[in-house]
Structure formats: C-alpha cells, structure tokens
Amino acid sequence: MARHTAKSHKIRKVEILVIQMKIYATILDNNVKYNYRKAVTQYMNRFELVVPCHFGLEAVVKREIYDLGYEITRVEDGRVSFEGDAEAICRANIFLRGAERVLLQVGRFKAATFDELFENVKALPWENYIPKDGRFWVKKASSIKSKLFSPSDIQSIVKKAMVERMKRSYHIDWFPEDGAQYPVRVFLYKDEVMVTLDTSGDSLHKRGYRLATSKAPLTETLAASLIMLTPWHADRILVDPFCGSGTFPIEAAMMAANIAPGMNREFTAESWTNIIPRK
C-alpha cells in the first residue's frame, strides 16, 4: 500500500512537471509571437526619408541627420536620404536647419514610357500611406535628362495611377478627398523615377518668425548652412555689417539659444494620423 502511494505520488509530480512545462512553452511561444509581431510592426513603420537641400551643401545636412541619430542611406546632388520611423519625420522637420523639406519616398523605379510610369505607380502600396478620405494630388513633377519630360503629363499619369490603385484597394469608385492633405512630388532623372509624399508642406526655410521680407533675401536654410560651415560657435561674437533683413544674425541667434528652426510653424504630416500616431 505504501509502495503504491509512493508510486502515485511520483506520477502526480511528473504530471505537474509536464503541466508546468506546457505552460512555460505556451508563455515562451506567446513571447516569441509578440516579439515577432513587434519586430514586424517596427519594420513596417520605417520609411525612406529624402531631404532636399542646396547643391553643394549636402555634407552639412548629412552631418545634421547624423547628429539626430540616423544612418544615411544615400547622398545625391541636392538630396540626402536616411531611414527613419514616424518620429524621425517629426524630428527632421523640426530640427534640421539646412533642409528644404522632408519627403517620404513611396517608390523608386525606371520608366521610359508613360505606360511604364502608370504601371509602376499603380503597383505602389498607396493604401499604406493615404486613407480613403485623404486629399491627394501631384503638387510638382520635375524631369532631367529623361525621355518623359512634360511635367504636366507626368502629374496627370501619376494621379490616374494612384486613383486606380486606391479604387482597387478600398473597393470604391469615388473619393471624397475631404480629409488630410497628402501632396505628392515626383522626380525623374535619367529615366529613374522617385515618387514621394511631402511631409513638410511649405518649404522649411519658412521658419515662422518673419513677418516681412526684403528684396532678394537670403533663404534661412542657406544662411544656416553657411554658418555651420564656419568655425563660429555660440560663445563667439558674430558680426554681419551687410545684414539686410538680418537672416545670418537671426539664424545664428537661434543656434546659440538652441531654438529648433521648426518650432514656430506647422507641417503637412501633422494631420497624418494613419502614419504619425497621437500619443
């Protein structure tokens, strides 16, 4: 009887151990699934961001992006690209002094005909960026050394392709376009097409502090970039005897006071709640 009781006790302990192992395995599996979903979400929410700047000043903007903690993915004439998340969109618009604007790259491909342009734009996942009530239009198209050279035709084809893609994705034939604005900018260079969403809206040289401008003013982004190329520091005096509207002194004063250039203005992407979540 005692031997039977001891045996039953051992069996019970084994059963409990098996149950504990199953529970542990379930928890581990759920953690793995959670971490996987988290990793996928973080990956899916990362974007290729393109920062246009003045020609010859790419190194200045590149250093600014590095200082914000992001890795550069590409440097071209008048453009610097880096990878970032929704927070990077906000930080770049607010803190970059030499950038003209911040663009979110939707796609990049080769196109030598309008059919190729249409099909490639249509293949882009626009539903991941623009909601069904979003107001979208091609704000600007530029073409350099490309077979497709008419900006107005490029704008028209890209808009049509976007509509066709979104009609299929949202299963609707008409878009109210009464929601947030999603301006599109298209660039062609040697038949390579880059399609982007403009997260900035007005050019970033519009800081929001100037009520009036003088004749032939120096842009704030150019002034800030030139200052950053000099050995000037905040503890030094800056003298500009031909200051005009005072762009150099104002930009230097903002640097010395550590005032972000985009603090006093708004950005288009502020209303993109599908991309930039509200906390």
Stretches found by the model and what they are:
Residues V50-L57, V61, E83-F95, L188-H233, ...:
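S-adenosyl-L-methionine
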